Amino acid sequence: TALKLSEKLDRYGIKIIGTTYKSLDLAEDRGSFSTLLKENKIPYPEFGVAETPDEALVIADKLDFPILIRPSYVLGGQGMKIVINKKELEDHVKDLLEKIPNNKLLLDHYLDGAIEAEADAICDGKNVLIIGIMEHIEPCGVHSGDSNATLPPFNLGKLVMQQIIDHTNKIALSLNTVGLINIQFAIKDEVVYII
């Protein structure tokens, strides 16, 4: 992945053109990224990070079902699943930890009935240009690479569109983005969450 490659280059002191490894890693690290979102007053679903089935069960008690589970630091929606009870959660967590050992698992409260959207933007570190905002056709939770979307969005009101624009600008600038950025959103009850 780009993150792994940039980490190696950073370790050897090789500068890259574009967003720094530190910013890429911050965007991928759920704990650090949620701090950035809090500082910018940007909503996101409640979440937890687990390394064992027991930890996942403790987190599930705090989040309430349904819960979206996925491995940390993987691409393509690998291992992502929405679970609706403790038995499903425990089975999926055990399966993931066998398939991808030594990986942390992300557990998000799943915003049932939410609409998914995403924004693509380009930033020079000071200015953000939103290239496009897409609205997904499938329910929120289907991996974006496996779903269809419309450009421009067909059913997002002015309030929602403004939140997407504001969130995209704040995140791109807070991460010191230099280059492209893609941000995914879940919209429920006119509130735009980062997912």
Positions of PLM-derived features:
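N-terminal beta-alpha lobe that positions the nucleotide/phosphoryl donor
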Residues: 1-183, 187-195
